[in-house]
Design a protein with these regions (language model features):
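A domain-level signal for the structural core that forms small-molecule/cofactor-binding pockets
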Residues: 2-254
Length: 254
């Protein structure tokens, strides 16, 4: 099996080339660099938990997969792992590249799932809770798995938009499908739902196991992280907040 040759292109002064995107393929610049240049030109971030789908052109995800595979093969070689003679690791570089780009971190490279929003024709204004939603991510420090549960509380008003139950899970999966820090991920989920639904109140609670604690480091198998985001009426009304948290805790016990 052959792998693409990765050619770094530099300008005469040693800095990264900034030629127009149309010329990059001819110059042999890696697709990751082309994408990075578009993001920088738009003055946007590309942190680990940012979505960069708007800057990836048709066909470039396949190119990116090939580039990550080639670079991952270099990592395996640096770890002194024989990928030629060992049939168990012969395809590991490609498997890992596919896992990151198409599964674990696909929330970085895919656009936001389509979500149909419905008007609140019945003028619903009572507490709604969705959960537990199983969520999976990876910490951006060690790329170790994060696995947990998410609960979402919504206090709609007559002007709020409503979404289907499955869409809460799809949006959460999209946000969590990137290298994340849990407290930031929960805020991103809350921001997304707040923008789409415009409720009077929004609450998000997440409890998760972090493999960077159980699989490495202190190797504590029992620790969990729990954090919450409260917006609007959940922040202002202590009784509503207590009701939401009590119902979530009852569901945990059940």
């Amino acid at each position: 099996m052959t792998y693409p040759r990765i050619i770094a292109h530099e300008s005469p002064n040693g800095s990264d080339a900034t030629a127009p995107a149309a010329d990059h393929d001819e110059l042999g610049v890696p697709v990751s660099q082309r994408i990075r240049e578009r993001i920088k030109a738009a003055q946007r971030r590309f942190h680990a938990n940012d979505n960069i789908a708007d800057f990836i052109r048709e066909g470039e995800r396949d190119e990116l997969l090939a580039e990550v595979e080639a670079r991952m093969r270099g990592v395996l070689q640096a770890l002194v792992i024989d990928t030629e003679s060992d049939h168990n690791t012969h395809e590991t570089a490609r498997r890992v590249a596919k896992m990151y780009l198409k599964e674990v971190f696909k929330g970085r490279y895919e656009r936001q799932p389509e979500v149909t929003e419905f008007p609140n024709v019945e003028h619903l204004n009572e507490l709604m809770i969705v959960g537990p939603i199983t969520v999976r991510s990876a910490c951006s420090h060690h790329f170790c798995p994060i696995v947990g549960k998410l609960w979402i509380g919504v206090m709609p008003n007559e002007h709020s938009n409503l979404i289907g139950l499955s869409k809460y899970a799809r949006l959460a999966e999209w946000v969590m499908g990137r290298p994340q820090i849990q407290e930031v991920a929960v805020t991103q989920v809350a921001d997304l739902l707040q923008t789409k639904m415009q409720p009077d109140g929004l609450a998000v609670v997440m409890e998760a196991e972090h493999f960077c604690m159980s699989w490495r480091g202190v190797r504590d198998m029992d620790s969990r992280m729990i954090n919450s985001v409260m917006r609007g009426s959940f922040l202002k009304d202590a009784n509503l907040r207590r009701e939401f948290l009590a119902l979530v805790n009852d569901r945990k016990k059940g």
